[in-house]
A protein has these predicted regions:
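Bacterial N-terminal signal peptides that target proteins for export
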Residues: 6-25
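Bacterial N-terminal signal peptides
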Residues: 23-34
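Structured, acidic catalytic/metal-binding patches in enzyme active sites
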Residues: 41, 49-260
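Residue-level marker for the onset of beta-strands and adjacent loop->beta junctions
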Residues: 47-49, 274
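A cross-kingdom marker for long, charged
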Residues: 258-315
C-alpha cells in the first residue's frame, strides 16, 4: 500500500472514537435466549446512568455509564461525575486511552491479504459505503481495504462527530482520564486494547457483513440515529441505549446473537467486574464505562449485586 494511503488511513483511525466501535455496533441486549425473551425482565437497572456502589464495609464508590461522544451536551452531562472523580482515589475505565491504541487498531482493521470489501458485500451495500464514506472524506479505494467490522466503525458516528474529534475536541470518556492525569488520580484499566481487538478480529465475517448491509443509504439517517442515541443518554436511560443495539443486530439469527452476546457482552462484563472488585472493596473510586454495560440480568450492576454490593441510582 502506498505511503500516502497509509497516512490517510492513519488519519481515518485518529478521527474515530475507538470505544464507540463496541458501544454502537456490538454491545447488545444481554439475553442468550431468542428475542421473545421478556424485554423488561432483561433490562433491570436500565433507568439511570450514575450509580452509587456500597458494601463490604468500604467507603462508597460510583459507577458512571457513558456515551463516548464529544457533543457538548454529552460532555456537560458528565459535570457531576467529574466532581465525584476529583474527590476519588481511583478512576476505573474500560480501556486506557493513549496513542498506542490508534496504531494497534490500525494494524488489525485492514486486510493484509488479497481480499477486498467490494468483493465481500453486495453491490448495493458497497454503493452505500462509497456514498456515505464520501461524506467523511474517504474514497472508495480507501474503504475497500477495510474489514467489514472496521467499515462499520467508520460509520458508527456521524461526520459531525468525526470532525470534532479531528479538531482535538475531547470525548466524555477522555475528559475523565484528563482530570485523573491532571490530579494524579490512579487510573485502573479494566481491559486491554489487545483483548478488545482479539474479540473484534475473531467475529464471524458473514455476521459482520450482515450488519454492514443494514447501513443507511443517506447520511441524514446516520445523523438522526446518532441524535436519538444522544437523547436517550441525556434522559439517563441505559435501557433505551441497550434496546437501540438490540434492534440493530436483530438481522442476525438467534444463534449468532447468542454468540455475540457471550463474546462481546457477557464475558466482558464478567471480566470487568472481576477486575474492579479490588478497588471497590477499597472504596472511594469512580468507574467510567459505556452505559450499555450497566443494565440486564448479566449487566455489570447485577453482577456487582450478586457479589454482595448494594447499588443505588443517582439522579
Amino acid at each position: 500500500m502506498a505511503l500516502m494511503q497509509i497516512s490517510q488511513f492513519q488519519r481515518l483511525v485518529e478521527n474515530m472514537i475507538f470505544v464507540r466501535f463496541f458501544a454502537s455496533v456490538f454491545f447488545v441486549l444481554a439475553i442468550v435466549l431468542p428475542l421473545q425473551t421478556s424485554f423488561a425482565e432483561s433490562l433491570i437497572n436500565g433507568d439511570a446512568v450514575l450509580w452509587k456502589i456500597e458494601g463490604q464495609g468500604a467507603e462508597e464508590s460510583y459507577i458512571y455509564g457513558t456515551l463516548n461522544s464529544s457533543d457538548r451536551r454529552i460532555v456537560d452531562a458528565g459535570a457531576y461525575a467529574h466532581t465525584l472523580l476529583r474527590n476519588a482515589d481511583y478512576l476505573m475505565v474500560d480501556i486506557l486511552d493513549d496513542d498506542a491504541i490508534k496504531q494497534k487498531l490500525f494494524s488489525v482493521m485492514l486486510y493484509n491479504d488479497n481480499r477486498r470489501l467490494r468483493d465481500l458485500v453486495s453491490p448495493e451495500t458497497f454503493e452505500k459505503i462509497k456514498v456515505i464514506g464520501y461524506e467523511y472524506g474517504y474514497l472508495a479505494r480507501q474503504m475497500n481495504v477495510l474489514k467489514p467490522w472496521a467499515a462499520r466503525v467508520v460509520f458508527s458516528s456521524p461526520p459531525s462527530e468525526a470532525s470534532r474529534i479531528s479538531l482535538g475536541i475531547r470525548t466524555l470518556n477522555q475528559t475523565f482520564q484528563d482530570i485523573a492525569n491532571e490530579q494524579g488520580i490512579d487510573i485502573v484499566p479494566l481491559q486491554t486494547i489487545e483483548e478488545q481487538l482479539q474479540i473484534a478480529d475473531a467475529l464471524n465475517e458473514a455476521d459482520q457483513i450482515a450488519l454492514l448491509d443494514t447501513l443507511p443509504a443517506e447520511i441524514q439517517t446516520v445523523e438522526g440515529i446518532y441524535q436519538t442515541r444522544i437523547n436517550n443518554f441525556l434522559s439517563q436511560s441505559s435501557g433505551a441505549l441497550y434496546q437501540e443495539v438490540l434492534d440493530e443486530i436483530s438481522v442476525l439469527s438467534p444463534e449468532a446473537q447468542a454468540k455475540y452476546m457471550e463474546s462481546l457482552v457477557f464475558n466482558r462484563n464478567r471480566q470487568m467486574v472481576s477486575r474492579m472488585e479490588e478497588a471497590l472493596r477499597k472504596g472511594n473510586s469512580l468507574t467510567v464505562i459505556d452505559a450499555i454495560h450497566l443494565p440486564g440480568q448479566q449487566g455489570v450492576l447485577k453482577l456487582l449485586q450478586d457479589k454482595g454490593f448494594t447499588i443505588t441510582p443517582v439522579k
